[in-house]
Amino acid sequence: MKDSRLDQFIHRIKAQRACLNMAARLVAGMDGPILELGLGNGRTYDHLRELFPGRDIYVFERDVSAHPDCIPDAAHLLRGEFKDTVPGALARIGAPAVLIHGDIGSADTSRDAELAAWLGPVLRPLAAPGAVILSDRELGAAIWPPEPLPEDVAPGVYFMYRAVALA
């Protein structure tokens, strides 16, 4: 029997939390900001604030509609389409990020694939050496090598990469 959409959502959110918690451990000794691509309801942003107290967390969002307690201040919110806000964002954030998280999936899988194919290369200059990149869509091993997922996360549910120089 196929999982219901609710079950699929729960699996994805549990995977997201497990990956974020693992990423927090992996970057604990590194300096730099956190990037959140897509604010949505603000749940992940809120979790990132818990994981990284005192760190700058920059959020990229087209249409802010999150819970009021989960909206970053204007200095940390890059409002607009990713294609307008992500390229050149390094000037605004001031330093490469140690963690980049993208929750970019939608019901339109062809749009998601196109966005992920574009996004992977554009994120390279925003990632510090050794940064962790997480996404609910595959960004491509040609951009960064895959990082092992937490043992309770099924392959294909979430994607984790490490920013290293590729030959």
What are these regions (language model features)?
Residues 42-46:
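Glycine-rich SAM-binding Motif I of class I
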Residues 55-61:
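Conserved SAM-binding motif I beta-strand of class I
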Residues 106-167:
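C-terminal substrate-binding/active-site "lid" region of AdoMet-derived donor-dependent transferases
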Residues 95-105:
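Short SAM/SAH-binding signature in class I
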Residues 28, 93-94, 126-127:
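A generic alpha-to-beta junction signature in SAM-dependent methyltransferases
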